[in-house]
Regions:
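Active-site loop architecture of trypsin-fold serine endopeptidases
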Residues: 3-17, 22-60, 65-108
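C-terminal recognition in membrane/secretory proteostasis and scaffolding
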Residues: 52, 66-67, 79-82, 93-96, ...
Length: 215
């Protein structure tokens, strides 16, 4: 059930199902080209997709299960004018997104403790690509830039590497890479699997707090 104030109608409750989990969704202020991403681009990390009606005014409201337990925070809708999940003035078409409660709780805790939220930073830019993986081909996030001195650089990541996994989770493009990084916390050690020169390599990266300014 989604609770909120759609179109100014306070206390509205709508029902639906969880349509999908771990759905990387670009927020409305992300850069124009969704195939060119950096790990500091704004996204909803691995969002919950729901069929419960979500409309403008629902953002920030609760998404709860049948027992009344909070499972997410309503955040965005897909519209006919926007295929990347960003909110718009269009109405609900049965595809809404919510930030998972665990991520929302982590951010809220940081805001209460320090007055600000920190986000993990890898230090790469990537694009969607299709690369050879043995005798097959697969989708991946292909690095277009690795910023000097960042966790990615220190771990040995290079421009041209095709990232296909993070901690065993499959990466099929730039958005899924960004979402996986955003799901972590500052200080986490993550194993990044890349394809380089036709060979798989596992590199360990320690994520740092996102700098105030990034290249």
């Amino acid at each position: 059930m989604a609770v909120g104030n759609p179109l100014g109608l306070a206390g509205t409750v709508t029902t639906g199902i969880v349509s999908a989990l771990n759905r990387p969704v670009t927020t409305s202020d992300a850069q124009t080209d969704p195939t060119q991403q950096t790990t500091s681009d704004p996204v909803v990390t691995n969002a919950i997709q729901t069929s419960a009606a979500i409309n403008p005014g629902n953002s920030g409201g609760a998404l709860v299960n049948a027992s009344g337990q909070l499972i997410g925070i309503n955040s965005a809708i897909a519209s006919l004018g926007s295929s990347n999940g960003s909110s718009s003035q269009s109405g609900n078409i049965g595809i809404g997104f919510a930030i998972p409660v665990n991520e929302a709780r982590s951010i809220a805790s940081q805001l209460i403790t320090s007055g600000k939220a920190t986000h993990p930073y890898l230090g790469v830019a990537s694009k969607d690509g299709v690369v050879a993986d043995g005798s097959a081909k697969r989708a991946a996030a292909v690095l277009t830039n690795v910023v000097s001195g960042t966790p990615a650089d220190k771990a040995g990541l290079q421009a041209g590497d095709a990232i296909v996994g993070v901690d065993g989770n499959s990466i099929d493009g730039s958005l899924s890479l960004v979402a996986q990084v955003r799901e972590r916390t500052v200080g986490d050690k993550v194993t990044i699997t890349v394809l380089r020169d036709g060979q798989r390599r596992d590199l360990e990266v320690t994520l740092i707090a996102k700098p105030a300014t990034t290249p």
